[in-house]
Amino acid sequence: MKLDVVTIFPEYLEPLRTALLGKAIDKGLISVDVHDLRRWTHDVHKSVDDAPYGGGPGMVMKPTVWGDALDAVCPDDALLVVPTPAGVPFTQATAQRWAAERHLVFACGRYEGIDQRVFDDAARRVRVEEVSIGDYVLIGGEAAVLVMVEAVVRLLPGVLGNQQSHEQDSFSDGLLEGPSYTRPVSWRGLEVPPILLSGDHAKVAAWRREQSLARTRERRPDLLPPESSSD
């Protein structure tokens, strides 16, 4: 998978080259290129923003700069991803769908966002998805890109040591993942649930399912189908 990120703060994306993501790069499973948007500016000050039409606070990122940048780094077969609090929710299902893509391009906005015409123009030749990682506002799109890339890349074959690691994740079956335990059996007066020590795989699986349902019912009842939410 090829990943391109366009931003005015390339250093913000350095975590993409660390830990498991860095190992995925070393293995050739992904390639990551981070591009400084200011390369495509047209003035000596390398300005990327201007005052909004219609008035209002803040600044809007220029279409002239972004248009040239996307022309250069976003080919017709790529998926262009725009992190924005005004986007559709990014979910595990989104991550799974994107994991099948060959090329993702992320456009990191700042200030009051990017001129809408940038995406309207891009949509003439590429698929564009405006996506939100939550109902809150960040300073820019870079942190959201780190979240989304990690969620997607960990699903690629060979990135995680154990394929079941993501197959049993929260949201993989529509539920939150239940509690996890490791050694020692007893710690500060708290015990590992005996069922996990039984060696009975069927009973362990049933217990984990029950815990997953209980946690989802308590913390995210909106994820449950109507017939399960009141069980």
From Swiss-Prot:
S-adenosyl-L-methionine binds at G109, I133, G134, D135, Y136, V137, L138. This is tRNA (guanine-N(1)-)-methyltransferase. SUPFAM superfamilies: alpha/beta knot (SSF75217). Belongs to the RNA methyltransferase TrmD family. It is found in: Cytoplasm. It comes from the Bacteria. One of its GO terms (biological process) is tRNA N1-guanine methylation. NCBIfam families: PRK00026.1, trmD. GO terms for cellular component: cytosol. Specifically methylates guanosine-37 in various tRNAs. Homodimer.
